């Protein structure tokens, strides 16, 4: 009862505010949703680049990360045993579409991966079952890359999320996370067969795109005329989320990888590239965490004679 009472008191306190923060996603059990979205995005990106570079360890990493993301989603649900009911809303809900995409991705991976990593498997990767698995995983991968940003833009009550750039930004995060996963995988599996120069070049390009998109989204929130969106930006840049943004997103996710990439700290090696990938992925997690936690609801009722920036 203590926990319920605390949540009730917090809700009452929030309702008294003109601009109340969303707490369902990112606090308490809601952290599992952030983790789940982060993991499946990285998983889809890892699978994409694993296919492009014909790198089986990258495919394995993508499959394992997707499984972890699925577990995190189940941990978020109040009644995990009812997860299958989400498929009923696939026509109207992006979360349901994401569930379908994750299911197809995992089932496809089960069909396609084993003959690539195990000898004597009953079917080959280039058999009918193998091609079916490849197609299912590829379709699920596309859904996972695309759907996450739309989950947030569909939340009309939180203007900061309701940006046309948000889905594109999440797609870019999936690509950046996928490259990071491959950089880490090369060290973990001791299989540096991927062209590291190409991976790093793509990572730099995608990182530049992420920076531009994020700056445009912040600029749009500040100049769009919606005080709730401006309050969200303030929460992230100078409020309760600032330490996660500056310490996690900028320092861990951008400054440290670029410093390592410069070669001034240590010569580039498989281990340094893995560190770049790890810090990059952590920065992406903090970015998603801060933007989700910074969400501010529209006021329940207008206040006359007051203007809150």
Regions found by a protein language model. Name each.
Residues 52, 78, 153-156, 188-192, ...:
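Membrane-interfacial segments
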Residues 282, 286-298:
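Membrane-helix cytosolic exit motif
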Residues 46-108:
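Membrane helical hairpin/interfacial module
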Residues 30-31, 35-39, 89-93, 101-286:
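Long, contiguous internal "core" modules enriched in hydrophobic/ aromatic residues
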Residues 295-309:
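Short, highly charged, low-complexity non-transmembrane loops/tails of multi-pass membrane proteins
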Residues 1-56, 60-63, 294:
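N-terminal signal-anchor module of multipass membrane proteins
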Residues 77, 81, 213-217, 290-292:
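Short helix-terminus and kink motifs of transmembrane alpha helices
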